[in-house]
Amino acid sequence: MGRKYQIISGDGHVETPPDGWLQYVPERYRDRAPRLIRLPSGADGWLVEGQPMLHNGQNIKGRGPVKFANASYFNADGSPREGAGDPIQRLHEQDLDGIDAEVLFAPVFVARFIESISDKAVYRSIVSAYNTWLAADYCSVAPDRLIANALIPVSGLADALAELSRAKELGFRSVQLQQFPNGSGAPKPEDDQFWALSLELGMALSPHFSFGGAVWRGDPRADTSQWSFEAAITQHAPMSPAATLAQLIVHGVYDRFPELKFYFAELNCAYIPGMLYYMDRNYHEFKDWFGVSLKKDPSEYVLEHTLFGMVRDAPVLRMGHLVPLERFVWGSDFPHSVGTFPTSTQQIKDMFEGIDEALRRKILVGNICAHLGLDPDADITDTPAS
């Protein structure tokens, strides 16, 4: 009997220098791709078209001190820091932390900041290169333990559909969204093609903590007469992913696609009971003015279609009378600054005190396996020696 899943982190981050995926960017576009430079302080900075200098900081903490800037992917001797190395190093870091697998999200430098690149062909080539490298050179070492999300471009529906299909061909189980499939911060009817294809392909949707833009509240200097209904029902519930959920609900996405599910990671989940309460209260308070009638309360839609990712969220595990704990997934957020590395097992023990074993298993293994189509009882890849 081999190694089994005991703890899966539903929230890890690929924080590596860009050299690996840059090789997959077509040569004609490579000079427009992001660059990592060494600063006089010894820290790293990112040069991305259309952005100011971007500093490594909270994204590469590992078990070092928290830094908001002046951090590096490299130790003083030039070796990779914790969380910034190759996939074998990452597997050893899982072992050190006492976990068996991670769901991996793209670094913010690739996921969001490259959206400022003006030439969309260049932008698309970078997204494609990152996904190719991730599948071919990183996750392939142990695809049952390094379970990454392919990144979906924000350059329009056609590009989103193409990369979704390519992600399936590359072997990904899940994709990460930054905007709605149409490429904007708001849903459009054409997005239905993407939702339908994701279900057809069996591709999970894991957009980190939100996607899309803020709900429209009009001129910030004006009164509430310009508010959208999404803005009204998220009043007093401003944290992610309330705006995304409100847009999906109000635009009928869940009614048209009752099988659609989303996993939102790293949510700091103790606020979720309040978010659900205010969304329901506001819906009943404001629906007549807006002339909106939903088939269900907002909280019902959310709980039927959403998994919530928790990190260091002990309070939410004491709120089972307010929100179903069966909808949660634990994550370490490694190597980011709010993470639990390398003491995840102790923190889990402390957080889950008094939680029955069946529920603990769902939060640590079962829910994320069901979302990704993994067998929770399968033998998994052992860590290579080097």
Segments from the language model and where they lie:
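Active-site loop-helix segments enriched in His/Asp/Glu that coordinate
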Residues: 95-98, 109-137, 157-166, 185-188, ...
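Hydrophobic membrane-embedded alpha-helices
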Residues: 108, 115, 120, 272, ...
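Mid-to-C-terminal alpha-helical segments outside catalytic/metal-binding sites
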Residues: 2-6, 19-73, 77-96, 100-101, ...
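Short glycine/proline- and charge-enriched loop/turn segments
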Residues: 117-119, 223-234, 344-349
